[in-house]
Amino acid sequence: MNTPFFISWRYQRGKQKNPLVALIAKFSAIGIALGVAVLIVGLSAMNGFERELNQRILAVVPHAEILSAPNATEPTIHHWQNLEKRLQQNPQIKGISPFVSFTALVENGSKLKVVQVKGVEKQAEDKVSSIGNFVQEQGWNKFEKEGGLVLGSGIAKELDVKVGDWITLLISQQNGDEQFAQPTREPVQVTSILRLDGQLDYSYALLPLAQAQTFLTYQPDQITGVELKLDDPFSARNLDLSMLNDYPQMLYMQNWISKFGYMYRDIQLIRTVMYIAMVLVIGVACFNIVSTLIMAVKDKQGDIAIMRTLGANNAFIKRIFIWYGLQAGMKGCLIGIVLGIILALNLTTFIQGIEWVIGKKLLSGDVYFVDFLPSELHWLDVLMVLVAALALSLMASLYPASRAAKLQPAQVLSSH
């Protein structure tokens, strides 16, 4: 066994002359453990939010939409099949789905709620999103055949609506002078509930494309726009649409980044801030090791003097106390990693338990894109936290170890 390591290990396990050394060592280990555990849990939560953003937002919302330009004389797109043929020339585009979109007031008795209604074709929509996976009770399979409204679960809860209930859509209409006329009232049956466990549940509803066109008195080839699925969602801003340069209608594109990109930026920003904050916390805890080692050096200076008289050089003495500091840091790291892993793997359940006890949601679904705290443990994060904590422990050990190596054995032994 490495002799300096063995001696430092015996010092760790042996009884200290000064009990304050052991007390400070315990507090430094606790501080490191808490910092490591919190950092692992925090990073796992950020990973969980990123996963849910991919699965519940990017899998549901279109990566890009082609719409009629706001200043165009015609607010809708006619003969959309011609537009589809042109877009298919771009290999970046993996799916195209026509849609009709409008804002309506949902009425159920005396309760009202403003919703964004989108009319889609099931088969085409399946090519651009996974929204069918979030429609409950096999409602997506019956969507096109039976018609009716797929309503967000948050809207259904607020309006006290269940599957099979009839509600009324109040749809505003424009006359030829582009002035709003008396809204039309369209009764429609709720055939299924859409549950994404987040913000979209409180603002989103789906209709079959043909039914939506009928409500708006559109022609069969008349739509609001087309949804696009791209091979790389992050290339949406640089999508090549040169094939539409000579299209007979003014069009424009909007992408998911303009709507939801802030969520990705916020997650990355919080992750960075969390790294900095927790490294500082671990750093403060690690520098308790400085105090521990300085006191340990003073406690063991007689042993150091004896080893120096027996031939131990400066490097030998320095390695003893570097190992001493690393072992103190490793103890806190291991405790923190075990605690952090257990909490990260059970974070969602743990938070749900707290919500059950206090009787309140910590994350409101109508504010955040998910209404629960997700978690996903990445072992690379655990390794990075371990390396960072050990590196800080090593840095904290260097100064006290150097002081131990500079002790003069003659002075120490003469004072004993």
UniProtKB/Swiss-Prot annotation:
Origin: domain of life: Bacteria
Membrane topology: Multi-pass membrane protein
Spans traversing the lipid bilayer: 21-41, 276-296, 334-354, 379-399
Primary location recorded for the protein, binned into one broad class: membrane
Any one GO biological process: lipoprotein localization to outer membrane
Subcellular location: Cell inner membrane
InterPro entries in the record: ABC3_permease_C (IPR003838), Lipoprotein-release_system (IPR051447), LolCE_TM (IPR011925), LolE_gammaproteobact (IPR011926), MacB_PCD (IPR025857)
Any one annotated GO CC term: plasma membrane protein complex
Keywords: Cell inner membrane, Cell membrane, Membrane, Transmembrane, Transmembrane helix, Transport
Function noted in UniProt: Part of an ATP-dependent transport system LolCDE responsible for the release of lipoproteins targeted to the outer membrane from the inner membrane. Such a release is dependent of the sorting-signal (absence of an Asp at position 2 of the mature lipoprotein) and of LolA.
Family: Belongs to the ABC-4 integral membrane protein family. LolC/E subfamily.
UniProt name for this protein: Lipoprotein-releasing system transmembrane protein LolE
Organism field: Haemophilus influenzae (strain ATCC 51907 / DSM 11121 / KW20 / Rd)
UniProt gene name: lolE
